[in-house]
Design a protein with these regions (language model features):
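Conserved phosphate-binding elements of NTP-dependent enzyme cores
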Residues: 1-898
Length: 898
């Protein structure tokens, strides 16, 4: 092996399916690890190199600190040398916080807040006038000039437009020795026991002094101004005794017309996550929750007794239905009247209640006399459950009848009026955060010429920081995002590239970066900019490892490691390591696709479709410009375009929610659109995404596809099981009976080590088999249920060749290229691409009407050229049966087959 310091050397890696491999990765270079889906790329990059790097870093902490950091198992590897500190940038969209935005994640918004706090100009939100502020000397000067020889009152404002009787306040004023106050514009004597109408809004000022302004240096005026400033917390008013006109003066920012004043701005005043800056109505979220009547009464053809009001369900013998029945009597209707035949007033009363008392007859409730109540309404009932003190279950239940709407107070800006009144070159901070990054960068490059000399001096360093960070975002192809874009709505590829831009911005050196398919979701155009950014990271003195299938990325790399030869058990070896030029001369599966020996062929002829179309008209969500789109049915349709062009908005956020609402009464609201036509030509919609099959390690391909039920039924029918009286539950590892109770069917035990990582050891009772001894004694063709779960799909296809019900379901998993995974493999160990193909296989094995619409978002994520060929065969099978497949994709091999 080479000199160790120039290379990262991995010896004897055995994580997952790696076959005791050695690997050598040059430092300070761009290395691509490629190979089939499931060949061991991520096992080498993330589960071995990154896991060991992170573990070594955590080892440097004290035992006390390690206690809080959770499990970091030592990867199964002999040793790794030459390892630098490791930073992993994965695709997972980890951020589920609705307050997190592109601006806050990249910290650009923090710099903008600083810019506005230090260099922003304040305007009054009442009059639009520019705010002014004075020193005490300037105020004195102004009064001497403006009121020379006039009789004036010096006032200190104490209450501005607030309710209350203010009895205690007047008492305090009298104790301080002041004789007069000005209440709601009228000067009065401060009398003992004085108080105001507590339910009205009032303005109260204390009269500090009444004097005639002299034309020379006036000591009395000077003292009165100082006292008024103290009493009025930096504000004072001057009342002209003759004309009764008032002027406002302040040490703080103040509107010269209305007297409105702002506190000195600080960065937190521009943060929607701080009470000082957030809009008081929506608490800085920009949206509020509103009850959606269409979700309460989705079908007006039903009657109330037939369940038209979803929160109430069908009519029962209960108080709420007696109340509604009594309420309907005055409209000459009953609970059996369809809602569409009820007058609007009746529906309004049912929803929003009324103050009128309703008579409930004694015969109904079995009492001696009639009963009178007021009905609060269904909406009020749901709103009560949304309150903070309701239980989490009740809140969740109520939430399904609500929809989010733009906050009526801040109109989505998230900030309070004061924060939005600070401007730089006519723009407030919200207007900057809604610009796309390209536009914002141009604006900031030209803003200097509009700033005063003082503003320029203050802003120079802040602007430099913001421009640098924006430039990094532009370099990784994110020019179409805006700073106020919610982090939750970003795709995996986008959030990964944002983290990449942040890392380039951090200017670290001697670090090992590991990235997981950064080119996901990137159009070919943006890909070159991404490669340039990765090379920039390398040229700063870092090592970069990229797990990637992209042809351009492989050819631009300094070094390529190709994993294979196949996937799963048949993979886990290094089939090639060297430069891209050397790779083109070899005969690995990857190199054959790169040098053109293998290719995905263009179809000889295109499908005609079934003659029908689905039309979506007037789509205008996010950045869509009122578009009309035709989807011809019975075809493979590819939706493509540069990053941020609106593909996901059109399909995932508009079309799919419309169809889900129509077919499954889904509660997800589509974005704005005009109309949809042609729904009668499809009968179901299936969204096949890359999310995990299940949330727990107990879910696996057998349980997800439903074949596990068939396998359990097969075992129940065996003579041995019948003699013992076993039912299907006996062969489940999720319920007690047949499972091993020592490990509760997990197959392993977790041993808590307190300040060391938790250790997972095979259960000493069942030795990882999950079932108890009696259950394992029932065998089919010599194999127990645990043996069956441990089989690969390829082996299971041979094993069950004479059991058509099981064979049909697992054969399809084999056909989508997953013959190497095990039937009982935990779904948490499957990659995104593998999970998606298990879902596709499940759909393929279902009874098929030929009128299904399938939606796939970037299905080639994580797939090698060969995997894409297999995937396209599967999709073509679906379309050949008459179904329609819509694919959002940038991959040219997929586009050319559409």
């Amino acid at each position: 092996m080479q000199e160790e310091t120039e290379y990262i050397n991995v010896y004897g890696a055995r994580v997952h399916n790696l076959k005791d491999i050695d690997a050598e990765i040059p430092r300070n270079s761009l290395t691509v690890i490629t190979g089939l889906s499931g060949s061991g790329k991520s096992s080498l990059a993330f589960d071995t190199i990154f896991a060991e790097g992170q573990r070594r870093y955590i080892e440097t902490f004290s035992a006390y600190a390690r206690n809080f950091l959770g499990n970091l198992e030592r990867p199964d590897v002999d040793k790794i040398t030459g390892l630098s500190p490791v930073i992993s940038i994965e695709q997972k969209t980890t951020n589920k916080n609705p307050r997190s935005t592109v601006g806050t994640t990249t910290e650009i918004y923090d710099y903008l807040r600083l810019l506005y706090a230090r260099a922003g100009e304040a305007y009054s939100y009442l009059s639009g006038e520019k705010m002014v502020k004075y020193t005490e000397e300037q105020i004195l000067e102004l009064i001497l000039n403006d009121y020379k020889g006039k009789r004036i009152y010096i006032l200190a404002p104490l209450v501005r437009n607030r309710k209350g009787h203010y009895k205690e306040l007047f008492e305090q004023i009298r104790k301080k020795g002041y004789l007069y106050v000005r209440v709601d514009g009228e000067v009065r004597e401060a009398l003992p026991g004085m108080k105001l109408d507590r339910y009205k809004n009032h303005d109260v000022e204390v009269v500090i002094d009444k004097l005639v302004v002299a034309d020379k240096d006036d000591t009395r005026l000077k003292n009165s101004v100082a006292v008024a400033m103290r009493q009025g917390d930096g504000l004072l008013m001057v009342l002209d005794a003759q004309s009764e006109s008032v002027r406002h003066y302040s040490k703080r920012l103040m509107c010269p017309v209305t007297g409105l004043s702002y506190r000195e701005p600080a960065p937190h005043n521009f943060s929607f996550n701080s009470p000082q800056g957030a809009c008081p109505k929506c608490k800085g979220l920009g949206v509020v929750s509103q009850i959606d009547i269409d979700k309460i009464i989705p079908d007006r053809g039903l009657s109330i007794s037939g369940g038209a009001i979803i929160p109430l369900g069908k009519a029962k013998n209960s108080m709420i239905f007696w109340q509604i029945a009594a309420l309907l009597e005055k409209y000459e209707a009953t609970l059996k009247t369809p809602v569409r035949e009820l007058p609007d007033d009746a529906i309004d009363e049912i929803l929003y209640g009324s103050d009128e008392r309703i008579k409930i007859k004694s015969s109904l409730i079995g009492t001696s006399s009639d009963y009178f109540v007021t009905f609060e309404g269904v909406v009020k009932y749901i709103q009560m459950l949304q309150e903070k003190d309701a239980s989490a279950t009740a809140q969740k239940w109520a939430e399904q009848f609500a929809r989010t709407a733009v906050c009526p107070e801040c109109h989505g800006a998230k900030l309070n009026k004061e924060a939005l009144s600070f401007r730089i070159h006519d723009k407030n901070i919200y207007e900057l955060s809604t610009m796309d990054i390209n536009e914002l960068y141009d604006w900031l490059m030209n803003v200097d010429q509009y700033l005063s000399r003082k503003q320029q001096q203050i802003a120079v360093e802040i602007l430099k920081e913001i421009r640098t960070r924006l430039k990094f975002l532009l370099d990784v192809g994110l020019d179409y995002l805006s700073l106020d874009r919610s982090a939750v709505s970003l795709s995996g590829g986008e959030s990964q590239r944002i983290r990449l831009a942040t890392q380039i911005g951090s200017q670290l050196v001697n670090v090992l970066y590991i990235l997981d398919e950064p080119s996901i979701g990137l159009h070919q155009r943006d890909n070159l900019r991404l490669i340039h950014s990765l090379k920039e990271l390398r040229d700063m003195g870092n090592s970069v490892i990229v797990v990637e299938h992209d042809k351009d990325m492989m050819l631009a790399a300094d070094y390529v490691i190709d994993m294979g030869p196949k996937a799963g058990r048949l993979g886990g070896e290094v089939v090639f390591a060297g430069t891209p030029q050397q790779m083109l001369r070899t005969h690995t599966l990857t190199s054959r696709y790169l040098n053109g020996e293998c290719a995905i062929e263009v179809p000889a002829e295109r499908r005609k479709g079934n003659g029908h179309s689905l039309w979506l008209r007037g789509a205008r969500g996010n950045n869509l410009k009122n578009v009309d789109v035709e989807f011809p049915l019975g075809k493979l349709i590819c939706v493509t375009g540069v990053s941020g062009s609106g593909k996901s908005t059109l399909i995932n956020e508009t079309l799919q929610p419309i169809l889900s609402q129509k077919f499954y009464r889904s509660l997800q609201d589509p974005l704005e659109y005009g109309s949809i036509e042609g729904l009668e030509y499809i009968d179901k919609v299936v969204n096949v995404d890359q999310s995990p099959l299940g949330r727990t390690p107990r879910s696996n391909p057998a349980t997800y596809t439903g074949v596990f039920s068939d396998i359990r039924n097969l075992f129940v029918g065996l003579p041995e099981a019948k003699i013992r009286g076993y039912k299907a539950g006996r062969f489940s590892f999720n319920v007690s009976g047949g499972r091993c109770e020592a490990c509760q069917g997990n197959g392993y035990k977790t041993i808590e080590m307190n300040f060391l990582p938790d250790v997972y050891v095979p259960c000493e009772v069942c030795h990882g088999k999950r079932y108890n001894r009696e259950t394992l004694e029932v065998r089919f063709k010599g194999k127990s249920i645990a043996d069956v779960l441990d089989m690969t799909i390829n082996r299971a296809v041979e094993f069950f060749e004479n059991v058509p019900q099981i064979l049909n379901k697992i054969k399809v998993i084999q056909e989508v290229g997953l013959g190497y995974i095990k039937l009982g493999q935990s779904s948490t160990t499957l990659s995104g691409g593998e999970s998606q193909r298990v879902k596709l296989a499940t759909e393929l094995s279902k009874r098929d009407t030929g009128k299904t619409l399938y939606i796939l978002d970037e299905p080639t994520t994580g797939l090698h050229f060969e995997d894409i060929r297999v995937l396209m065969n599967v999709l073509n099978k679906l379309v050949d049966k008459g179904n329609t497949v819509i694919v959002i994709e940038h991959n040219l091999d997929v586009i050319k087959m559409a």
